Amino acid sequence: MTSKSVKITDIIPQRKPFVFIDSLLGCDESSAETSYLIREDSIFTENGVFQTPGLIENIAQSAVAKIGYVSKFIEHGKVTVGYIGNVHHLIVNRNPEVGETIHTTVIFGENIAGIQLCEAVVRAGSEIIAQSSIKTAQDTSMPVDD
């Protein structure tokens, strides 16, 4: 996996306060890894705990970060708006707390008619705190303004 040093908002369509990854740690043809520091001021933090919808969005943004990186820096195209198509087999062992850094690994499966199938694992340290299958889609007719 190759390490990537890029500004996250250059490779995902989301903007603050709806950004739930801090860095793309690496990516290759079949996977991506991101990190995110859980913050008190996150819209998905409640009573010091990052809630499940935030974990889902973190997983989706982790998938889209790799897609955006390839689009912008390899294909020299634009980052486009993406959608969560389906979340399947979501298991949350625990929700992370403020101050913890989570690492999300996404393994890319088939891409069927523009629908990207992925498997994701979210860790805090060596502990698996969540995992899921997810489907995402990119709307190539809706590029994000730089």
Language model regions located:
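Active-site helix/loop of acyl-thioester processing domains in fatty-acid/polyketide metabolism
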Residues: 51-76
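HotDog/MaoC-like acyl-thioester-processing domains
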Residues: 97-103, 107-146
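Beta-strand-rich interaction surfaces with strong enrichment in secreted/lumenal proteins
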Residues: 9, 21-23, 47, 91-95
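Hydrophobic beta-strand-centered segment that forms part of the acyl-chain substrate-binding groove
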Residues: 67-103
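Catalytic strand-loop segment that frames the active site of acyl-thioester-processing enzymes
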Residues: 16-51
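Short aromatic-glycine motifs in intrinsically disordered, low-complexity regions
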Residues: 5-15, 79
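Short Pro/Gly-enriched beta-strand edge/turn motifs at strand-loop
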Residues: 2-8, 100-104
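Short, conserved beta-turn/loop elements at beta-strand boundaries and strand-helix junctions
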Residues: 27-32, 64, 111-115
